[in-house]
Swiss-Prot record:
Superkingdom: Eukaryota
Protein name according to UniProt: Uncharacterized protein C4orf36 homolog
Length: 117
């Protein structure tokens, strides 16, 4: 396994908080191989098809034609909710602009020092 400098640095940043110290690229390759072997020995169902150096073959699946469209009532509710959300966002933007404009109009200067007691 050949590890270039960018990949080595990336993995080193990931390993910073762990107990592993990676000095050389071949140490990193050995560590990666050990992790991979440990993962395959666990025999998780989704890792069963992974073999060293070979790509996974994905199976083609059929899409179902029996999909139901949402009802008119749910579509109307969603449209109403979205309209309210967009109106609320627009109001927030307007309030933000008003606050910024009012802050720009104020004269800002140094504070006067407090009177001694």
């Amino acid at each position: 396994m050949a590890y270039g400098l960018p990949r080595r640095n990336t993995v080193q940043t990931i390993l910073k908080g762990s107990c592993y110290k990676v000095q050389e690229p071949w140490d990193l390759a050995e560590l990666t191989k050990t992790w991979y072997t440990n993962l395959t020995n666990i025999r998780l169902p989704f890792l069963g098809e992974i073999v060293f150096g070979s790509p996974m073959n994905l199976l083609a699946s059929q899409t179902k034609q029996e999909c139901q469209f949402p009802s008119m009532q749910s579509m109307a509710l969603e449209k109403e909710y979205e309209a309210k959300r967009l109106t609320k966002l627009k109001c927030q933007e307007n309030v933000c602009k008003e606050i910024q404009a009012s802050l720009r109009e104020k004269k800002v200067g140094l504070r006067r020092p407090l009177q001694p007691k």
